[in-house]
Amino acid sequence: ISASSSYGGNPMACAAALASIEVIEEEQILENVREVGAHFMQRMLKMKENHPIIGDVKGKGFLLGIELVKDKNTKEPFDEAGKLVYQKAFAKGLAWIPAGHILRMSPPLIMDKEYADMGLDIIEESITEVEKEFGYR
């Protein structure tokens, strides 16, 4: 019976983890995530007010989501709209992973407000186009 393992207490992995933590602290990455994450949520809440197919917006830091629904009262998921918004935004240069009726976002932790706004502008344009296609506007 061995008292050690290949994955526990690996000095190289520990050094890499410590170096990563030091960079996060020195470059104030968490502060950026808090500030820009709050900006994301502010913008997304405004989008929710202005778009009939946005049922809800959720997020903390840089883990964000926009829920697309057919009706805000019933909250019926709108998968078709999610697919089209994803495709339109991707064609405009926004790279992300489709997730049905949830527009899921997890940008790099170093993203600033300018790039956040660029991405949200693309998403909002794409949502507006999809709403027109489905007769919501």
Residue ranges: model-predicted function:
Residues 1-137:
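Conserved N-terminal phosphate-binding loop of PLP-dependent enzymes in the Aspartate aminotransferase
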